[in-house]
Every structure is written in C-alpha cells, then in structure tokens.
Amino acid sequence: MCRASQSPWTRDLLCELGFHYDSNALNDDLPYWDMVPTGRRMLILPYGFDTNDMKFFHPNGFVRPSDLSDYVGAALDVLVAEAGQGRSSLLSIGLHLRICGRPAGFQAVRLILARLAELGSKIWIARRRDIAAHFRTENPIDVSRE
C-alpha cells in the first residue's frame, strides 16, 4: 500500500490500465511527458498541494475560509501577471466534499469562484482531462527522439 505516494511501478500500471495521465506529481507548474520504467511515455499533470483545502487539517495550515481564498487569489495574481509575459502555468485547486463541502469551507469556494469570475477570459478553467487533451495536441510525443 502506497497511501498518497507512488510506488516505482505506479506509472507503468497506469499506462497498462489505459490511463491518459498521472496527477500525483507535486514537482512542476506545467504538464510534461515522463518516461516510465518500461519505456513508455506518460503525461504528467502536476498537482499543487499548496492550493488544497487539506491545509485546513494541517496544524500550521488554513484556519478561516479567507485563508484559502486569499492564497488562491495571490497565486492567480502571480500567474496572470506571468501569462502577460508569455509564460503559461497550471494551477490546481484541490477541494474535497468533506472539507469545503461543509458550510464554512464552502465560503472559501464562493470566494474563489468570485475571483475566477473577475478574471474572466484571462484564465482557462478546465477539467484535467481537457488540459491533458490540449497538451497532447500541442506537445505530441516526438518518437524520433525516443
């Protein structure tokens, strides 16, 4: 059992089972291709734990709903500014029903949604599968470099 971390075989198993991407990496702001031990390529859609409501359960984490929404808002401000300079990024916002589905936690969701609405066309709100499809189209595997 691996709990939240991966085993050395996880990505191979994901490929074998037909998964199109892995979102269990915390190491980047952009999707990328990774070579798995059997030589296959796996699309990695990194996940950011800093913008995750689980921080409400961490002793040094978020306390008030505005802690999460302010943090996400600050991240959005930086990423929108960077996008204005031509740099793309991926911001994952992790929400769990058992946390932000509760009344006080849901206030954070409302605040985040309001901020996203303010940004309008400056951002793309997408499901992970849509991000994966877009990345595959824009960054196909170059088999000549294999």
Predicted regions and their residues:
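Active-site-adjacent pocket scaffolds in enzyme catalytic domains
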Residues: 1-87
